[in-house]
Amino acid sequence: MLNVKPRDVLDFWFAAGWEKWWKRSDAFDAEIRQRFGKTYDEAVAGKLDSWMGEPQGALALIIVLDQFSRNLFREDHRAWAQDVKALSFAREAVRRRFDVEIPVMVRNWIYMPYMHSEDLAVQEEGLGYFARLDNPEVMKSAEEHADIIRRFGRFPHRNHVLGRVSTPAEQDFLDSGGFSG
């Protein structure tokens, strides 16, 4: 898709819905790659930073960097390569109060980079934002992510992809069906 606009990203993402967001689907991943692969590359290169000029653009840019990356690069270190950049944009969006200008039902997507961080202080900061949403399901997920970071200091399910050696406690957690991310 050429000349993608923030609205294109948002319309696509929100039309997809919970089923596609949280269940692995090679077809959905392929659709993101086909429609937004170049958009992702442009975002990584900083060519879409201007989207941060308004709330909807900020939301779209964060989704591209924080969510599309996970669909584009499953089982690849690049799935998390833009997490720092996405978090930086999320923090900027919050600082500029863009989050409160976005409907509460989709606001969690601005906060997702906090949930994806392996830094406990960032996780704790994010919990405050997620608590404001008054969405028990989203809050439960945020708490689960933070608990894993409290326990291990990182997400063990990323270890094999990132070339990290799992500790015995992490391996036990993974073997017992621990969080898969």
Model segments located where?
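Intrinsically disordered, low-complexity activation-like regions
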Residues: 1-59, 64-75, 80-181
